[in-house]
From Swiss-Prot:
The gene is dnaA. Pfam families: Bac_DnaA, Bac_DnaA_C. This is Chromosomal replication initiator protein DnaA. Residues 111-329 are annotated as: Domain III, AAA+ region. GO terms for biological process: DNA replication initiation; regulation of DNA replication.
């Protein structure tokens, strides 16, 4: 990269980071690469699904950086990651020794969902370790963490990560023997083969895999299915002894799989156990920003933030809300989704689903102030002593995390402050939490008092 290209790209990243929320920037911009700038055309390498976001949101950024560095209007030519991967993969396929085709083992249908990848998985603090572990397993299956056990509530991305691991391994090695299956379907297959007296086929199918991906392993924890547990135990041992990768997901930790045999629980803990928790507000905004690319509607930022505040339990609720909105907007022939339109469209879903507790900002200010020895009135005022500033910024952070209020609304409740002040406080506290365990504990203590 030439000096001017480096300056241009640094400026693009700087402008993008100043305009986007951190989680949005991390997902849509962080992994993009400038390949070259030639004849006023910038060639940018990124995931194809992110092209529309760049076209909609970053055109002005590129134009600004172009005029600053080259004193010219810079256009963009996107090179997609998928195209390069396919090209590289085809080369690998062509290079495979012919004797691999003579493999005597029966073919296995992976049952992977090709739409799930690491590239389109939205990362946040609540899932960062799970993503990192999944990528490590995909890069070196059978060696790094075996088994990998991912647990968390429904709709948080466990199935997405399982499929992303499988798709990544398959992309690197098209001949890999991979199987994605739910524990329930494993049970069903076991029952069928028992009835047909074809257990040898089941054993051959599962014990010769390179990668086994089991979803919702808690379904195996049923006392009436001891025969199934025995078969899975033997399958696990056969794969693990041959350094074949096993990844499992569950809605609870291994120690809480109460009806599972102890010897299985022990093996589940041999490798690495990671947790996924519900996405925070900023991650929910990033998820929505990504998902709305699939719809032909305009979603203003205040609508996105409103929706992010309405559903705080899992990703499926967010996806379902967008489908509700799309249905209503298509029927009414609406192009722009305002907060009022979104609220009307999701009303039934909110009534049927779990209610998000309405927490007054005054309560957050009162509890935050009490913890740090200041009053709610002082938090709203302009005084800037150290303990008041910390209490104020923590309260702003919690107001954004625990309510569905927009940034301007939160700023108004803090003495009429600008929305940028709220955003600065939120980002500052979030960064401090990642580096200061004592502050994280303090904030969790305040949250528990508010709830």
């Amino acid at each position: 990269m030439t000096e001017n290209e480096q300056i241009f790209w640094n400026r693009v990243l700087e402008l993008a980071q100043s305009q986007l929320k951190q989680a949005t920037y991390e997902f849509f911009v962080h992994d993009a690469r400038l390949l070259k700038v030639d004849k006023h055309i910038a060639t940018i390498y990124l995931d194809q699904m992110k092209e529309l976001f760049w076209e909609k949101n970053l055109k002005d950024v590129i134009l600004t950086a172009g005029f600053e560095v080259y004193n010219a209007q810079i256009s963009v030519d996107y090179v997609f990651e998928e195209d390069l991967m396919i090209e590289q993969n085809q080369t690998k396929i062509n290079q495979k020794p012919k004797q691999q085709a003579l493999n005597s083992l029966p073919t296995v249908t992976s049952d992977l969902n090709s739409k799930y990848s690491f590239e389109n998985f939205i990362q946040g603090d609540e899932n960062r370790w799970a993503v990192a572990a999944s990528i490590a397993v995909a890069n070196t299956p059978g060696t790094t963490y075996n088994p990998l056990f991912i647990w968390g509530g429904p709709g948080l991305g466990k199935t997405h990560l399982l499929n992303a691991i499988g798709n990544s391994v398959l992309l690197e090695n098209p001949n890999a023997r991979i199987k994605y299956i739910t524990a329930e379907n494993f049970i069903n297959e076991f029952v069928i083969h028992i009835r047909l007296d074809t257990m040898d086929e089941l054993k051959e199918k599962f014990r010769n895999l390179d990668l086994l991906l089991i979803d919702d392993i808690q379904s195996l924890a049923k006392k009436t299915l001891s025969g199934t547990q025995e078969e899975f135990f033997n399958t696990f041992n056969a794969l693990h002894n041959n350094n074949k990768q096993i990844v499992l997901t569950s809605d609870r930790t291994p120690d809480h799989l109460n009806d599972l045999e102890d010897r299985l629980v022990t093996r589940f803990k041999w490798g690495l156990t990671v947790n996924i928790t519900p996405p925070d507000f900023e991650t929910r905004v990033a998820i929505l920003t990504n998902k709305i690319q699939e719809y032909n509607f305009i979603f203003p930022q205040d609508t996105i933030e409103y929706l992010a505040g309405q559903f705080d339990s899992n990703v499926r609720d967010l996806e379902g809300a967008l489908k509700d909105i799309s249905l209503g907007a298509n029927f009414k022939q609406i192009d722009t989704i305002t907060v009022d339109i979104a609220a009307e469209a999701i009303r039934a879903r909110k009534q049927d689903g779990p209610k998000m507790t309405v927490i007054p900002i005054e309560e957050i200010q009162a509890q935050g102030g009490k913890f740090y020895g200041v009053t709610g009135k002082e938090i709203k005022a302009t005084k800037r002593t150290q303990n008041i500033v910390l209490a104020r910024q923590v309260a702003m952070f919690l107001a954004r995390e625990m309510t569905d209020n927009s940034l301007p609304k939160i700023g108004k409740e803090f003495g009429g402050r600008d929305h940028s002040t709220v955003l600065h406080a939120y980002n500052k506290i979030k960064n401090m939490i990642s580096q200061d365990e004592s502050l994280r504990i303090e904030i969790e203590t305040i949250k528990n008092k508010i709830k």
